[in-house]
């Protein structure tokens, strides 16, 4: 690899590291590269890594966030602020729903949420949510979603949400803090070089090393398009990789649509249309889907996004995958 005559760093040294905090040192660097790399990594880490957060809450007897709950010290607005601080970890980034039955007296903490689910791990169980008096009885439903950065409540609203569901702002980013510092260093007798010190703190859902690796990969994947301007196109995917992709899609097509974890409205529409498997679904065209009763543009967009996440789309010719299955 050409270094274009520039002083290249010897590597990245890990100074301190724990499950949630780490310091990384890169050097030596040409003057100016510390800020260039440090600032780019910091912005990507804060904005582009995926995480889990509560996206909506429903409390029996509560119609809006300006309500109060009998026997609960905090009003709903304060309760929501506390729920925003609850941090989750899961083996897979997927949406889920939790139900809690709470009775006073006592404190409602994130530990109660942790006990209500086997799908997610709560990383800050001591997080206070609300104070319940002796006569307090609170039934709560929580929707947990995944995303990047900060998402306002308006974007978490769904047209098929029942009355009483309150969409909330979500802080998805798993990064709590990123700071960098550029210090002078020397190479031999030359002292006009730099080293970059990058401090990363996560919420514990991923390690600082994992966070740095993901952030650097995102940067690399974007910048690589400029590198490829004068390069030959990428070679065709090897036969074995193609076979693995065919196998993956074949298995997906055989799964029931229940595996897509759709909203109630979309699920009921598919059930009414007798669409039982993902294969049945992707055979359809988008225009055809809109003809089904109670199936609107928002439901269609939900399905388009869910299929896209799995490398699928409407109007697929699934016969080649079925033929593969017969041939095997």
UniProtKB/Swiss-Prot annotation:
Whether Ribonucleoprotein counts among this entry's keywords is no
Enumerate the catalysed reactions: RNA(n) + a ribonucleoside 5'-triphosphate = RNA(n+1) + diphosphate
SMART domains found in the cross-reference section: RPOLD
Q: Residues annotated as region Alpha N-terminal domain (alpha-NTD)?
A: 1-230
Q: What class of enzyme is it?
A: transferase
| Any Pfam family | RNA_pol_L
Q: Where is this region: Alpha C-terminal domain (alpha-CTD)?
A: 248-328
Q: Which family does it belong to?
A: Belongs to the RNA polymerase alpha chain family.
Q: What function does the entry list?
A: DNA-dependent RNA polymerase catalyzes the transcription of DNA into RNA using the four ribonucleoside triphosphates as substrates.
User: What is the protein name stated in its UniProt record?
Assistant: DNA-directed RNA polymerase subunit alpha
């Amino acid at each position: 690899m050409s270094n274009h005559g520039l002083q290249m760093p010897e590597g990245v040294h890990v100074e301190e590291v724990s499950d949630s905090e780490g310091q990384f040192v890169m050097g030596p660097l040409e003057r100016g590269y510390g800020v260039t790399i440090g600032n780019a990594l910091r912005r990507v880490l804060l904005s582009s890594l995926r995480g889990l957060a509560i996206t909506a809450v429903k409390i029996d007897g509560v119609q809006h966030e300006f309500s109060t709950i009998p026997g609960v010290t905090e009003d709903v607005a304060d309760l929501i602020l506390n729920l925003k601080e609850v941090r989750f970890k899961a083996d897979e980034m997927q949406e889920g729903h939790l139900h809690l039955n709470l009775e006073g007296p006592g404190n409602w903490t994130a530990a109660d949420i942790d006990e209500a689910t086997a799908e997610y791990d709560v990383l800050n169980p001591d997080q206070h949510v609300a104070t319940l008096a002796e006569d307090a009885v609170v039934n709560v439903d929580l929707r947990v979603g995944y995303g990047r950065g900060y998402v306002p409540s308006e974007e978490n609203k769904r047209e098929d949400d029942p009355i009483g569901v309150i969409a909330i702002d979500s802080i998805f980013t798993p990064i709590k803090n990123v700071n960098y510092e550029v210090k002078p260093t020397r190479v031999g007798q030359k002292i006009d070089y730099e080293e970059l010190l990058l401090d990363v703190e996560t919420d514990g859902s991923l390690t600082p090393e994992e966070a740095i690796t993901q952030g650097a990969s995102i940067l690399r994947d974007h910048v690589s398009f400029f590198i490829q301007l004068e390069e030959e196109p990428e070679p065709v995917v090897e036969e074995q990789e193609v076979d693995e992709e065919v196998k993956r899609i074949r298995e997906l097509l055989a799964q029931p649509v229940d595996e897509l974890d759709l909203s109630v409205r979309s699920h009921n529409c598919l059930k009414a249309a007798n669409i039982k498997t993902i294969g049945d679904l992707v055979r359809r065209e988008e225009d055809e889907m809109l003809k089904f009763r109670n199936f609107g543009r928002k439901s269609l967009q939900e399905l388009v996004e869910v299929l896209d996440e799995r490398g699928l789309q409407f109007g697929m010719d699934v016969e080649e995958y079925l033929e593969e299955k017969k041939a095997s």
